[in-house]
Amino acid sequence: MDSAASHSVACHSTKMVALGLYFTVVVFVLFITSVNLQSPATKTEKTPKISRLYFGTLEYVNATKDQELIDGVFDAILKRLNKLDVDNPHEKNVGRYDMTTLLCWAVNNDLLYRKYGENMEVIFQLAKKFYPERDDKDKDSLGINRSLGTSKLLKWELHG
């Protein structure tokens, strides 16, 4: 082999080794990142962090027009909100965010009229749980439910 060919092979081998080392580092970094993301709690936390519910996800569920799926997601959100601990500041904050997201999803959503109507009392209790400072003495659950969903219920009652 002449020196030019030998030099070319050596350069190619060096580049392959460097590329291999680069990929090894990338894979290691991705592995460490995924382990940290999957870890339920870091060393400084005593409890796992709870993620927020994202409106875009609910829009996607709505776009399926699968009533059983939509009802199941709605029920799962209510169940999750019931489990959150308002004495934990992080969970209370997540609960407030998710409660607002749930109400935004339910507003003017033809696919949730029935489900919302069936769960108005639960939604009212959850609103009191996450927003106790809004518990006005002159409002009862019926008055608040009316202000949250009057047009929704009227439309639901008219269209069944």
Curated annotation (Swiss-Prot):
Q: How does it sit in the membrane?
A: Single-pass membrane protein
The induction comment states: (Microbial infection) Up-regulated in salivary glands following infection with dengue virus type 2, Zika or chikungunya viruses (at protein level).
Taken from the UniProt entry, a GO cellular component term is: membrane
Q: Where, subcellularly, is it found?
A: Membrane
Bilayer-spanning residue ranges: 17-37
Tissue expression remark: Salivary gland (at protein level).
Q: What is the first-listed, main subcellular location in coarse terms?
A: membrane
Any one of the GO BP annotations: regulation of defense response to virus
- Tell me which UniProt keywords the record has, alphabetically: Antiviral protein, Glycoprotein, Membrane, Transmembrane, Transmembrane helix
Is 4Fe-4S a UniProt keyword of this protein?
Answer: no
Where do the record's glycosylation annotations fall on this chain? 62, 145
Per the record's keyword annotation, is Transmembrane helix included, yes or no? Answer: yes
The knockout note for this entry states:
(Microbial infection) RNAi-mediated knockdown results in higher levels of Zika virus replication in salivary glands after infection.
Please describe what this protein does. Answer: (Microbial infection) Modulates replication of Zika virus in salivary glands.
Q: What is this protein called?
A: Salivary gland broad-spectrum antiviral protein
Name its species.
Aedes aegypti (Yellowfever mosquito)
